Amino acid sequence: NNIPIYTLQNGAAGKADWASKTADEIAADIAGILNYIDTLTQNVEHPDSWVMPNDLYTSLNLRRIDGTGESVLSYIKDHTPQIKNWEVAGELSKGNKDYNSTGKNIGLLYTKDPDKMSHEVPMAFLQHAPQDRNLEIVINCEGRDAGMMIPYPLSACLVYGL
């Protein structure tokens, strides 16, 4: 795929994952991702949606910035008004081996526009009429899924190792 991948820098603890980073380092990562897209697309693309694993969202929402009552997530939301949609997806979690084989949390920053990214289903799930076969009733089903269509791959950015 041609979707750009942003590489996280190690924090003061020597690790790149957000569980090991301070609030300032996480904010710097978000700024770095946004600046990376701006530089890569020469300010043409302006992503407005961020997807992250459920457990990471909860962790950032419950973790307080030292000396304040504000959570890391609320601080990031307040200071990145260009990101309007904050979404969670369990498939991006490092613990979900069915969909995520990297062993790391994944983040996705993208432009929520059906012209730039869409899920194509050429044939929706269809159940045919029940048929008697021998001593059982069989219901044949069919469906087709084309997956994600991303005609503008630079309108999204993947981040591994959150």
Where are these regions (language model features)?
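Long, contiguous amphipathic alpha-helices that act as assembly "spine/axial" helices in icosahedral shell
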Residues: 1-12, 38-51, 131-145
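Alpha-helical scaffold segments that mediate packing/assembly in large oligomeric complexes
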Residues: 1-29
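Phosphate-interacting basic helix/loop segments used at nucleotide- and nucleic-acid interfaces
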Residues: 23-43
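Short His-Asn-centered micro-motif
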Residues: 50-55, 110-111
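Short acidic, S/G/P-rich loop/turn micro-motifs used as interaction or catalytic elements
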Residues: 55-63
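Sequence/fold signature of self-assembling virion shell proteins
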Residues: 62-162
